[in-house]
């Protein structure tokens, strides 16, 4: 079930005037989310032809005049990431050639974000390459949610709005009135994210799962830094991919005496064997994610809760269009 989190945002905006220049188009990767955003904004999705030729090439044609318009292109670059990325680039190019005044690429999920630096010789920094492609295609601005690496914003020489799914996740957790809460980072790299999350939850205590290898060819040892005994642990991450890290962390928290374990993440990548790990492990009371990436019915399981970020994205798009503050949404 997808729950719409309306707080702290309105359920819909006031009606736009007939002569407004805001246009919203959807790629094929998450049309359901795009429809929700369009309802929040009170506008229809722009008409567009998308098709694939027999040889696999993609084709896009905008079906209305967008000359002088402020155009927003919704396209999370999730699986199949290369097809969805290429479709986004073609959409941007089509809008540029149609004389749009401003083109904003809206990426609720930014694929290739984990390839943000070289970890070995002769590697590509693919997150930077994607930034170059989006810019060169003709985007004037990018709007993305919960980047795996915040420094990706610096890969762009155009305005970049980085928004967070935490208001939606936190609002839902507050509604559950969980007692003895402790926010847990599944690794040292996620401490800043977990700390900010804990602060919004009435300064809840913070714990960290620390991985360290004692010697070469020796398995990693996991330690919990912080007190979780008898507490409700909320594991917070930007994404759940194969679910190995978060299940490993939950298992350790249970061993250390946590009474309940919840998992929270913005992006449900859910690469195999994530569904089997999350649903069959019995480790989690609830796995809470958002709908930045579509989750097919066959990948849903009883412990899964999907929260909608449509209102948050819609409000952000409206504020950008109206040249209002975006950062004030997250204070």
Swiss-Prot record:
Binds 2 Mg(2+) ions per subunit. GO terms for biological process: 5-phosphoribose 1-diphosphate biosynthetic process; purine nucleotide biosynthetic process; ribonucleoside monophosphate biosynthetic process. Mg(2+) 2 binds at residue 187. Pfam families: Pribosyl_synth, Pribosyltran_N. The keyword Metal-binding applies. It is found in: Cytoplasm. D-ribose 5-phosphate binds at residues 213, 237, 241-245. Signal peptide: none annotated. InterPro entries: PRib_PP_synth_CS (IPR000842), Pribosyltran_N (IPR029099), PRibTrfase_dom (IPR000836), PRTase-like (IPR029057), Rib-P_diPkinase (IPR005946), Rib-P_diPkinase_bac (IPR037515). ATP binds at residues 55-57. The keyword Disulfide bond does not apply. GO terms for cellular component: cytoplasm; ribose phosphate diphosphokinase complex. It comes from the Bacteria. Its cofactor is Mg(2+). Its EC number is 2.7.6.1. PANTHER family: RIBOSE-PHOSPHATE DIPHOSPHOKINASE FAMILY MEMBER, RIBOSE-PHOSPHATE PYROPHOSPHOKINASE 1, CHLOROPLASTIC. Involved in the biosynthesis of the central metabolite phospho-alpha-D-ribosyl-1-pyrophosphate (PRPP) via the transfer of pyrophosphoryl group from ATP to 1-hydroxyl of ribose-5-phosphate (Rib-5-P). Homohexamer. NCBIfam families: PRK01259.1, PRK02812.1, ribP_PPkin. Belongs to the ribose-phosphate pyrophosphokinase family. Class I subfamily. This is Ribose-phosphate pyrophosphokinase. It comes from Synechococcus elongatus (strain ATCC 33912 / PCC 7942 / FACHB-805).
């Amino acid at each position: 079930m997808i729950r719409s989190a309306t707080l702290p945002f309105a359920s819909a905006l006031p009606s736009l005037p007939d002569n407004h220049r805001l246009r919203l188009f959807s790629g094929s990767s998450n049309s359901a989310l795009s429809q929700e955003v369009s309802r929040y904004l009170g506008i229809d999705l722009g008409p567009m032809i998308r098709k694939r030729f027999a040889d696999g090439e993609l084709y896009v044609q905008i079906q209305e005049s967008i000359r002088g318009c402020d155009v927003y292109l919704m396209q999370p670059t999730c699986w199949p990431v290369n097809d969805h990325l290429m479709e986004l680039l073609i959409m941007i190019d089509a809008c540029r050639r149609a004389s749009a005044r401003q083109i904003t690429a809206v990426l609720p999920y930014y694929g290739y974000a984990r390839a943000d630096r070289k970890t070995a010789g002769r590697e590509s920094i693919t997150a930077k390459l994607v930034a170059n492609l989006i810019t060169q295609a003709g985007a004037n601005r990018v709007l993305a949610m919960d980047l795996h690496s915040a420094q990706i914003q610096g890969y762009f020489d155009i305005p970049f709005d980085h928004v967070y799914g935490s208001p939606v996740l936190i609002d839902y957790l507050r509604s559950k009135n969980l007692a003895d809460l402790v926010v847990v980072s599944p690794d040292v790299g996620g401490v800043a994210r977990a700390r900010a999350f804990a602060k919004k939850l009435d300064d809840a205590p913070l714990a960290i799962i620390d991985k360290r290898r004692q010697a070469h060819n020796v398995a990693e040892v996991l330690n919990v830094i912080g007190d979780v005994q008898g507490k409700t642990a909320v594991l917070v991450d930007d994404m759940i991919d194969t679910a190995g890290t978060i299940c490993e962390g939950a298992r350790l928290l249970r061993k250390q005496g946590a009474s309940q374990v919840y998992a929270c993440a913005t992006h449900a990548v859910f690469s195999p064997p994530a569904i089997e790990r999350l649903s069959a492990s019995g480790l989690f009371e609830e796995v809470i994610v958002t709908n930045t990436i579509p989750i097919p019915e066959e990948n849903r399981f009883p412990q899964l809760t999907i929260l909608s970020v449509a209102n948050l994205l819609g409000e952000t798009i409206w504020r950008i269009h109206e040249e209002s503050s975006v950062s004030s949404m997250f204070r």
